[in-house]
Regions:
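Short, small-residue-biased leader/transition segments that mark boundaries at the very start
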Residues: 1-3
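Transmembrane helix-bundle core of multi-pass membrane transporters
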Residues: 104-179, 206-209, 271, 276-278, ...
């Protein structure tokens, strides 16, 4: 216990001594990791807002996309070229998952959909563990590493590329949702599914497309994870916790808030890692989620008191 306290104090001292340089490094790393969080969280917000399904397999979709890129890499397909391939495969997988699982539980109680997606999560974990093994895997993207401040700040170009790809893909999704007829139908269904049916929108098809689009988004996020971090079959729960924390804090249908909260969570994890150790990074995400839930509950109580 005393040793861990001393380590924390040493890390704090290091952070303050090298504050300008360390803060630049932490802020950059938070932005890089936050961009990937934002993609996965937006997919969850889409499914949650349109279908009222809390997908507990969200993180496993991300890891699955990463493993698909990993497999393609070993047959000579680079991760950037693999992006559209993985997105397409994950889209098809999402459609099949909807037809086999989600469609059967979407009209039931929320607890039923939670159990269904939790079961899907466990299934995917075991399949990935069976195929790829429990070892940590990564892709050598062969991107160079840039340095700043005489080498004290490192900027892996793989992370810069992943940030640009995440931003470009997010922009495509926004344009699609606002300009395309399918995107407008998704938004109409999210606002009022019954009214959308009256207007002639096939909501069942919209639900299938929405869940598939979410899977494709997670697949792209997974490819980016494979470039800049590591893959392991049971890491999905970590990304699921992060996406739920982000969506809970940002709210549904608010993309700027999702992006902002994703960056904040990325920074929180980076500072928690440097001060308390890498094992505290995930704990920081859980604490953020708990803090948001408590804050939401306080806000609801205040609103009820005003109504009374």
């Amino acid at each position: 216990r005393r040793s861990s306290d001393l380590t924390m104090l040493d890390n704090l001292q290091l952070l303050f001594v090298y504050a300008p340089v360390m803060n630049v490094q932490m802020l950059l790393d938070g932005i890089f990791i936050g961009a990937v969080f934002a993609l996965a969280a937006y997919g969850l917000a889409l499914v949650w807002g349109v279908m009222n399904v809390k997908n507990l397999a969200q993180g496993d979709f991300v890891i699955m996309g990463g493993y698909l890129a990993f497999s393609l890499y070993h047959v000579g397909v680079g991760p950037i070229i693999a992006l559209p391939i993985v997105a397409l495969v994950m889209f098809v997988f999402g459609w099949i998952s909807y037809l086999l699982i989600i469609k059967r539980v979407i009209d039931n109680d929320m607890f039923v959909s939670l159990l269904a997606t939790f079961g899907l999560s466990l299934f995917l974990q075991q399949v990935m563990n069976l195929i790829y093994g429990p070892e940590v895997q990564t892709i050598d993207s062969k991107f160079p590493i840039a340095t700043m401040f005489d080498g004290f700040v490192t900027v892996p170009m793989a992370k810069v590329v992943s940030l640009l790809l995440a931003g470009g893909f997010a922009a495509l999704i926004v344009v699609f949702m606002k300009k395309s007829r399918t995107g407008q139908a998704i938004r109409a269904t999210a606002q009022d599914a019954r009214a959308a049916r009256v207007l002639g929108i096939n909501t069942d098809r919209i639900y299938a497309f929405t869940f598939s689009l979410n899977a494709a988004i997670c697949g792209v996020a997974g490819v980016l994870v494979s470039i800049i971090w590591v893959l392991q079959p049971f890491y999905g729960i970590v990304y699921s916790l992060r996406t739920f924390a982000i969506v809970t804090a940002a709210g549904l249908g608010n993309l700027p808030a999702v992006i902002g909260v994703s960056f904040v969570l990325g920074w929180v994890e980076q500072y928690a890692g440097i001060i308390m150790g890498a094992e505290w990074q995930i704990a920081a995400a859980v604490m953020v989620l708990l803090g948001v839930l408590v804050w939401r509950q306080i806000q609801l109580r205040r609103q009820r008191q005003v109504v009374r």
